[in-house]
UniProtKB/Swiss-Prot annotation:
GO CC annotations on file: cytoplasm
Residues engaged in binding Mg(2+) 1: 354, 358
Organism of provenance: Arabidopsis thaliana (Mouse-ear cress)
Binding residues for Mg(2+) 3: 497, 501, 505
Domain-related comment: The Asp-Asp-Xaa-Xaa-Asp/Glu (DDXXD/E) motif is important for the catalytic activity, presumably through binding to Mg(2+).
Official protein name in the record: Terpenoid synthase 17
EC number: 4.2.3.-
Tissues and organs where the protein is expressed, per its UniProt entry: Expressed exclusively in flowers.
Cofactor: Mg(2+); Mn(2+)
Superkingdom, taxonomy of origin: Eukaryota
Ranges spanned by the short sequence motif DDXXD motif, renumbered to the chain: 354-358
Gene transcribed to yield this protein: TPS17
Length: 601
């Protein structure tokens, strides 16, 4: 028996439950298995650009995207209401009271409580105790100077720094000065404290633009941890060494919170002093969350299948599962189910829009499509080519149905903000398409002006739609003011994307890319350009953290969504574009660990 939405706390009315069959007739769908062998690709007739303006405008880009890796897999995964009920009952009745008592225990010092909170965060169960954690941290932050003065343990200070900053408290970095020698450098003796070094490495990712000491800490710890893990006579235990390797590959701050939990549970289970209650709670919670994710993927796969765009528009990237993975980065807690569904639907349909502009449409077709988006009128598309009508109708109807769904909750205005962002995306897509058709390489600054508009801020806007516990007008006004945090998010995405998709996109003739623009403008090698762009990238990350810690115009839940926006790029674009080509790389394994395999209890 398949679990229904109402069985485990989702909204009674399904979001966008049906699609007009006359608008989206069913044809055929890819039915690929989970085989890791790439399936046969669709081949579109592509005409290369020539020097003739007419030919230039009528040419189609050359792009062949691999089909979906997952097909209809999640539609066949069985789910039972009893599973949800059993997990929920044990979590609520047995686990939560025990852990709540741990947090409130008078035997624990402030430092011990903070370390417990850190453990709960890493295990993915801190969200169950938001009120208790806020009370503990609020009280401790008021006594921070005294706490720091009495503490000289590197791991503890670094843990406090990570906890306070990720929870929105601006703990100063001067606490790390005590670990420096007379020469102003971090003491070499610290390298003997392996766990302290690892925790300092994680904390070092949370610096702001003026905190040079955090850059020093990152360089100091990374070099020594890399040496430690590459040394065959290393003193770290095998499971700790593996944990360090994982951190060096992808720091916690750059990972999805639920993936941090998945990996940390495996590590924590091998710790000799692990707490059985916390370990069991973490396993139950992960499996409970996983059931929600599978149900949501079933709903989304059904929705995507009914739209049937993968067969009608075979040039697009059919990536509903990968898009959902990105939405999961924004919020993993079960209560945000509706938010994940909304973000996935909008992002997937915007991906269709993007691929039409980048990978198939001629310049006149792209121009007419973008113009239609500016007018935002379904009755004004009769003159569009048939396939362009399908693209516009798909985006328009998806947003209209979401608006109808959210109107009773008083969330229409934020949906309109999302529509405005899509219109802005269209203008940027058109500008970049013109460059591509003309093989024009703009200056780096010109490119970034439009490239930043196709980055991450719109993703944040989509995530606000279902944040019913936050004031809509307050959120909209802040977002529309174009805060520095949004610019920094765009910069992080744009640079990471352009560096790690460079080879793939240049092979498709997409010469107007940030890395290529920088190389040409400054007359430097690829390696030199990457080095300079990474400096810009690093500074953007610092701005994100600074804005997260200092912004007061919106509540912390909104800022957390923004902080989380950048997390999936370290999976999609870690070394290459795994979103576009998911058959090669680690992304498919990560998705499998989240959505296919539960943790044995």
């Amino acid at each position: 028996m398949e679990a229904t939405r109402t069985s485990f706390g989702l909204h009674n009315a399904p979001l966008c439950p049906t699609t007009n069959p006359s608008l989206f007739p069913r044809r055929w769908l890819h039915k690929h298995t989970l085989s890791l062998k790439p399936a046969k690709q669709h081949h579109l007739v592509c005409v290369r650009a020539t020097e003739s303006n007419d030919n230039l405008e009528s040419s189609r880009p050359l792009a062949h995207f691999s089909p979906t890796l997952w097909g209809d897999h999640f539609l066949s995964v069985p789910l039972h209401v009893a599973e949800f009920d059993d997990f929920s009952r044990e979590i609520e009745v047995t686990m939560k009271p025990k852990v709540r008592d741990m947090l409130k225990s008078s035997k624990n010092s402030d430092n011990e409580r903070i370390r417990l909170i850190h453990l709960l965060m890493n295990l993915g169960i801190a969200y169950h105790f938001e009120i208790e954690i806020d009370e503990i941290l609020g009280q401790a932050f008021g006594n921070l100077d005294d706490i720091i003065a009495k503490e000289n343990d590197l791991e503890t200070i670094s843990t406090m720094f990570e906890v306070f900053r990720l929870r929105g408290y601006y703990m100063p970095c001067y606490a790390f000065n005590r670990f420096k020698g007379e020469d102003g450098r971090f003491k070499e003796s610290l390298a003997e404290d392996i766990r302290g070094m690892l925790q300092l490495y994680e904390a070092a990712h949370l610096g702001t633009p003026s905190e040079d000491i955090m850059d020093e800490a990152l360089s100091f710890t990374r070099y020594r941890l890399e040496s430690l893990t590459s040394n065959h006579t290393a003193t770290a235990s095998p499971h700790l060494s593996k944990h360090i390797q994982n951190a060096l590959y992808r720091a916690r701050y750059h990972n999805l919170e639920i993936l941090v939990a998945r990996e940390y549970i495996s590590f924590y289970e091998q710790e000799e002093d692990h707490d059985e209650t916390l370990l069991k709670f973490a396993k139950l919670n992960f499996n409970y969350c996983q059931l929600h994710y599978i149900q949501e993927l079933k709903d989304l796969t059904k929705w995507w299948k009914e739209l049937d765009l993968a067969s009608k528009l075979p040039y697009i990237r059919d990536r509903i599962v990968e898009v959902y993975f990105g939405a999961l980065a924004l919020y993993f807690e079960p209560r945000y189910s509706l938010g994940r569904i909304i973000v996935t639907k909008i992002t997937m349909i915007v991906t269709v829009f993007n691929d039409t502009c980048d990978a198939y449409g001629t310049l006149p077709e792209v121009t007419s499509l973008v113009d239609s988006f500016q007018r935002w009128d379904l009755g004004d598309i009769e003159k569009l080519p048939s396939y362009v009508k399908i693209v516009f109708r798909g985006v328009f109807e998806t947003l209209e149905e979401i608006e109808q769904e959210m109107r009773p909750q008083g969330r229409s205005r934020i949906v309109q903000v999302a529509v405005d962002e899509i219109k802005k995306l269209g203008k940027a897509y058109l500008a970049i398409s013109k460059w591509a058709r003309a093989s024009h390489v703009p200056t780096f600054e010109e490119y970034m002006e439009f490239g930043m508009q196709t980055s991450m801020d719109h993703f944040a806007a989509y995530s606000f739609i279902a944040m019913e516990d936050c004031d809509e007008n307050q959120t909209c006004e802040w977002y529309k003011s174009r805060p520095k945090m949004m610019e920094a998010l765009n910069g992080v995405f744009r640079i990471k994307n352009d560096i790690n998709t460079f080879e793939q996109e240049m092979s498709r003739g997409e010469v107007a890319k940030g890395l290529n623009c920088y190389m040409k403008q400054h007359g430097v090698s690829k390696e030199e350009a990457i080095g300079e762009m990474n400096k810009i990238y690093s500074n953007y990350y610092k701005i994100i953290m600074e804005e997260y810690l200092t912004t007061t115009a919106v509540p912390r839940p909104i800022l957390v969504r923004c902080l989380n926006v950048s997390r999936p790029i370290h999976h999609f674009y870690k070394e290459r574009d795994e979103f576009t080509d998911p058959y090669f790389g680690m992304l498919k394994e990560v998705i499998t660990s989240l959505f296919i395999h539960p943790i044995p209890l």
